[in-house]
């Protein structure tokens, strides 16, 4: 997987990378290691929730100008855990579903390397000052 400059210390800790980014959608990948697992040797739910939160929020932060950095905070999020994962690469996909100038709603899914659904979620996000929507 291609190395990227970390977006934050937390991103560096978890280890996800952006693999695809388009207006309204983003795809992340995470190569699982032992430190992502819980005591049952499955991916910890917090890791899955973090992947969903990041994919869903990043989906609404796209800008065609790479110099424009848009930021948002999570207002609410629901996560449903469907099946366990313990090895391989996870893929998280976030998609914007609606919103306005200051808030947007997204959904997301996490899949294992075999395409099995591991978790899904929905979230509402508020754009930070200076990050308001550039339009449709």
Predicted regions: what they are:
Residues 1-136:
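Terminal targeting signals and extreme-terminal segments of soluble enzymes
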């Amino acid at each position: 997987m291609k190395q990227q400059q970390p977006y934050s210390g937390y991103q560096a800790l978890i280890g996800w990378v952006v693999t695809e980014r388009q207006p309204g959608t983003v795809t992340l990948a995470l190569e699982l290691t032992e430190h992502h697992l819980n005591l049952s040797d499955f991916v910890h739910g917090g890791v899955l929730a973090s992947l969903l939160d990041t994919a869903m929020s990043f989906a609404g932060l796209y800008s065609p100008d790479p110099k424009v950095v848009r930021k948002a905070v999570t207002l609410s999020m629901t996560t449903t855990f469907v099946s366990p994962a313990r090895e391989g690469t996870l893929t998280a996909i976030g998609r914007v579903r609606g919103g306005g100038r200051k808030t947007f709603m997204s959904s997301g899914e996490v899949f294992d390397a075999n395409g099995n659904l591991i978790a899904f979620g929905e979230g509402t996000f508020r754009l930070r000052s200076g990050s308001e929507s550039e339009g449709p």
